[in-house]
Amino acid sequence: MISDTVIAILAVALVGSTVQAAPVDATATSTSGIIAVPISKSAAQLAREADPVVSLDWLKKTKAQAQYKHKQANARLHSKRATGASVLTDQGSESLWTGPITIGGQSFTVDWDTGSSDLWVPSSACSSAACNAHHKYTLTSTGKKQSGTFSISYGDGSSASGPVYKDNVVASGLQATSQVFGAVTSESSSFSSDPSDGISGLGWPALAQLSGTSYFWSLINQGTVTSPVFSFRLATTNSELYLGGINSAHYTGAITYTPVTQKAYWTIALGGVSVNGAAINPSVSSAIIDTGTTLVYGPTAGVAALYAKIPGSASMADTYGSDYQGYYTFPCSAVPTVALTFGGSSFSVPTSAFNLGTVSSGSKQCVGGIVGQGDGSWLVGDVFLQGVYSIYDVGNARVGFAKTV
């Protein structure tokens, strides 16, 4: 694939709103300042495109991260009971969609993640190799240290921790005043190669480990965004997070909305799953929509039923061992059309996203991007989201999908 410099549009409009405001289309804010910003793909993604063989180590790592991320957040959840578009960079095998923010006037790149609800970046007090590889936060005149500490762990054994601060956070001109965030002083060495400096969560407040609201919820509460809605276009080029509305330039046709069933993750009802037009039993009829997860994970039984409909498919565990339980291969010459149904509308997984690459050099078997894991909700990540324009409506507690362009 040819490497391009990507041009994305940032539209900024600082207009007061209430939580009940209706979603605002980007075309309604054409009087706002518009800035064209060039971004490029990461080295990791370019390397992956040049090599069609999927990394077996990456398969293990990405599954472990997805599994542990939601297990940890669920434990925390149970213990509790104007517009602006931010340009995103596809970080490919790093499993991240990153974009720029400033904290106290200092620039950072963060992973925008609908599957978590906290904001954290490295602190200048951190001297580890991982921290030194990234931008670090220094306390400013607008910042203030808070009581308590922040700590998070990941499925591959890595972790990050540090004190809590408040400072002004800005993305695409939209400022959240006195935003709470973690400033990491201890960070595992495995973070050294991460393309982002930290994470900005877009999940509901119930998921948060930090006390206080997340960045986008602060924008709503402070009357900064036009509408309590954000939306994503995720693609190999021109990816965008649109804060405070919907960008009609990135979708076509009608938007199908599905109500959120639990205000923690963006969890909605899954209406069905099909393979090459044939319906299968999904086993579980709920789905978590998560931009911070690369693949699509489903209940073991549901995913087994899916691949049973694909001639020539095989479980990777039979050949490569239990570390690859839940992964399947299929003939590269016949990439299936898999579709998920939400709100009565069917949306296909892009075949280019479903096909993760050949299982080994010269093999005619490719690895599928839908993986069996456990018996809980479907976890719908970027393999599906690259085929839709996704809308997250806080005010009406619903998720919308439309055909992306």
From Swiss-Prot:
One of its GO terms (molecular function) is aspartic-type endopeptidase activity. Keywords: Aspartyl protease, Cleavage on pair of basic residues, Disulfide bond, Hydrolase, Protease, Secreted, Signal, Zymogen. Optimum temperature is approximately 40 degrees Celsius. It is found in: Secreted. It is an enzyme of class 3 (hydrolase). Residues 22-81 form a propeptide. GO terms for cellular component: extracellular region. Residues 97-402 form the Peptidase A1 domain. Belongs to the peptidase A1 family. Possesses acidic protease activity. Hydrolyzes casein and azoalbumin in vitro. This is Aspartic protease. It comes from Phaffia rhodozyma. The gene is pr1.
